[in-house]
Amino acid sequence: MHAPVQQRFGGHGMHASGEHRGAAQVGRPVAPMLAASAPEVSQALAGACSVERKLDGIRVQGHKHGDLVAVFSRGLDDITAQVPEVAESLAALPVRSAVLDGEAIALRDDGRPEPFQGTGARAASSKDPATLRRQTPLSTFWFDVLLADDVVLLDEPLTARREVLSRIVPTKM
């Protein structure tokens, strides 16, 4: 269990409403949903599908309840202290509570991503986060919402989750 995070969020996490009580709770990271490949392109495109750009950064899961925020890595480690700008972007969202899935990426001045090695080193570094932030600032790209204002969205179709996401996340963060 992530005791320090649970203590920040009141001991047991915020219980979400809905059928998946316990599956998505603020303060308790959940394993990320990962893309899967199909044996043939025709099979992948047979039903409804979504095509997106691959953002090669640090996979992050953001948790917010009121003024409290936590950022978790793909491995479910609490990396809030290492990525303060991600935590700030999460805190600024106009929702009471949320669990979001996204990528944190270092961008060049022209808007193109830095090589992954530079971005990936941010979460793993033991250097001072303020120094790292000045050297390699991160931009946050939230691409999915698992919970918003205490409503669990895990069973909702991607189109519905994206609608909620568009209401709570500005297009540029």
Give residue spans per PLM region.
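Catalytic cores of nucleic-acid ligases and guanylyltransferases
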Residues: 1-173
